[in-house]
């Protein structure tokens, strides 16, 4: 019997996969426990529509990430901050990923989730710093942050 897997099953099949399995196994275990459904023509058509919608959503999200990457890596996109600093160019306080995201949105209108910034620790010195951002699977950008001394 041909079945369409609804959930991933280790060693048997992945979600959305169509496989031929013994009738008893399909009816008594897979279908009964909600792991699969029978591969009728209507179920196969539904599966194709769902897979196409998922692929379109993936492509749209990737295109949006590419667009944000272009904006972030533009030469004019530099997030500026003013902060008090000591004599050795060390800041009193620090610039966290949350502040960087807020500054980016305020100065350029670009929204990025702060969890996507790969900043191991907050910035604690004056000058330019490059902050890598993982926007999407395979799409990475760099935000340039410039911190100047406050008068």
Curated annotation (Swiss-Prot):
Q: Which UniProt keywords apply?
A: Ribonucleoprotein, Ribosomal protein, RNA-binding, rRNA-binding
A molecular-function term among this protein's GO annotations: rRNA binding
InterPro entries in the record, alphabetically? Ribosomal_bL9, Ribosomal_bL9/RNase_H1_N, Ribosomal_bL9_bac/chp, Ribosomal_bL9_C, Ribosomal_bL9_C_sf, Ribosomal_bL9_N, Ribosomal_bL9_N_sf
- Presence of keyword Transmembrane helix: no
- SUPFAM superfamilies attached to this UniProt entry: L9 N-domain-like, Ribosomal protein L9 C-domain
Q: Name one Pfam family in it.
A: Ribosomal_L9_C
Which cysteines are cross-linked by disulfides? none
- Kindly list the GO CC terms recorded for this protein: ribonucleoprotein complex; ribosome
GO BP: translation
Q: Which family does it belong to?
A: Belongs to the bacterial ribosomal protein bL9 family.
> Which purpose does this protein serve, as stated in its record?
Binds to the 23S rRNA.
Entry-linked HAMAP family: Ribosomal_bL9
Protein name, entry field:
Large ribosomal subunit protein bL9
Give the species.
Lactobacillus johnsonii (strain CNCM I-12250 / La1 / NCC 533)
Gene behind the chain: rplI
